[in-house]
Amino acid sequence: MAHPAQLGLQNATSPIMEELIAFHDHALMIIFLISSLVLYVISLMLTTKLTHTSTMNAQEIEMIWTILPAIILIMIALPSLRILYMTDEFNKPYLTLKAIGHQWYWSYEYSDYEDLAFDSYITPTYFLEPGEFRLLEVDNRTTLPMEADIRMLISSQDVLHSWAVPSLGVKADAIPGRLNQVMLASMRPGLFYGQCSEICGSNHSFMPIVLEFIYFQDFEVWASYLYIVSL
């Protein structure tokens, strides 16, 4: 999760986020080189006393400043398109989880398990335990198995919301009357935090998301326990 004075992105816990971080560094390096070149040219223009008042055309320069930007745009576009197609790949997901946005909480439904659904509200500050995070904890964490492809179906019951978990590289709009889907996976166990990322009303800042990734066998035990409790 994010921490004070953080300069970079959150640590990646999914292959998609690792690709996004690599693309971010790639694009940032290109921008740095372009900025350095522009500053260098500006400094030359400010310090040189030579002028070219008689130059009417310079086809070589025009060709360079047309072709070079096109090459740079291609260098940025190709890895971006690759990641875009990766996010749309759905190969036999282990389970399907449906997230429904409300003002101002989330509802979750495990489509592969009978009667396994719950609401997830923010934990009030006065109920927080030592070590828990203000405005990020919920009363019911969303538990998922690690190292498994999970299909998320995201919608809304009232207004526009957005389901986002930065460390997984996942962000999808929750739109009333429409289902959006994304694929997510975690390569390690742990707690991962997110929030609603679409302004949805006065309590928009109080819609946290907490995903708890655990081992396969522990997840099956957890799902069986909730099913027994719901009977």
From Swiss-Prot:
Residues holding Mg(2+): 198
A GO molecular-function descriptor: copper ion binding
Location in or out of the cell: Mitochondrion inner membrane
Membrane topology: Multi-pass membrane protein
Cofactors demanded by this protein: Cu cation
Top EC group: translocase
Reaction equations catalysed: 4 Fe(II)-[cytochrome c] + O2 + 8 H(+)(in) = 4 Fe(III)-[cytochrome c] + 2 H2O + 4 H(+)(out)
The protein's Enzyme Commission number: 7.1.1.9
Record topological domains on the Mitochondrial intermembrane side: 1-14, 88-231
Entry GO CC: mitochondrial inner membrane; respiratory chain complex IV
Alphabetical list of NCBIfam families matching this protein: CoxB
Designated name of the protein: Cytochrome c oxidase subunit 2
Organism: Alouatta palliata
Biological classification of the source: Eukaryota, Metazoa, Chordata, Craniata, Vertebrata
